[in-house]
Amino acid sequence: ALMQSGGFRKALLLDGETRSRIYSPKDRKTAFLFGDGGIAAIIEKGDQFEESYFSLNSDGSKESYIKMDAGGYRNPSSVETLKEKVVDEHGNIRTEEHGYMAGADVFNFVLLEIPKDIKSLLAFSNFSTSEIDYFVFHQANSYMNTYLAKKLKLESDKVPTCIEKFGNTSSVSIPLTIVSELQNNLEGNKKILLSGFGVGMSWASTIINMQ
């Protein structure tokens, strides 16, 4: 939006995630899924690039799918919120200030909403899947991304993945996948579709050009 207003043409975007500090190491349902990471990306506006397309979505009714119960303004940190508690019959332990996910709900949400969002964006932009060089999905779950690729009838070599190397690095996962898996495949002007989701629930897709 800032670039579109004409204020500047080039920006350095820095993003870092330390998920290991948010999830309890004693919560085996969640902690082992995540990794820490950071990226730096240069974003540029110019006449040499084709038009980009975006789809941004949010549904607050599903806020319980990924959340942290305390530690913010609504439920401030206290002695009570920092107490470790056994949270299920499997002996998983966390405090109210640790994050957690309703895994099955998140999984079902993604399989329902993300394919629809991608198809809608492709229709709006008048592109077919064959005209997109790569599809880069948020690296949350390898099975989930395999399903998305099959649902959209994508060739496997157009859907890079790095979750086996780094785990789920949250907002870093898409640019990290580009750097890790595509850095030697971006010569010329490549058209890439990015799609991710997260807390909210919120989800978004974009078609951009990379050089």
Q: Which residues does each PLM region occupy?
A:
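Claisen-condensing/thiolase-fold acyl-transfer catalytic domains that form or cleave C-C bonds
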Residues: A1-G7, L111, P115, D133-Q211
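Stable alpha-helical structural segments in soluble proteins, enriched in small hydrophobic residues
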Residues: D117-S125, T177
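Flexible, glycine-rich active-site loops centered on histidine and acidic residues
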Residues: G6-G38
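Acidic, glycine-rich active-site loops and adjacent beta-strand->loop/helix elements
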Residues: D15-R21, N57-D59, K165-G167, G196-M201
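Condensing-enzyme catalytic core mediating Claisen C-C bond formation in acyl metabolism
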Residues: D27-N108, L112, K116, F197, ...
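Acidic-glycine-rich active-site phosphate/pyrophosphate-binding loop
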Residues: L12-R19, V86-G91, M144-S156
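Short, surface-exposed connector motifs at secondary-structure boundaries
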Residues: N126-E131
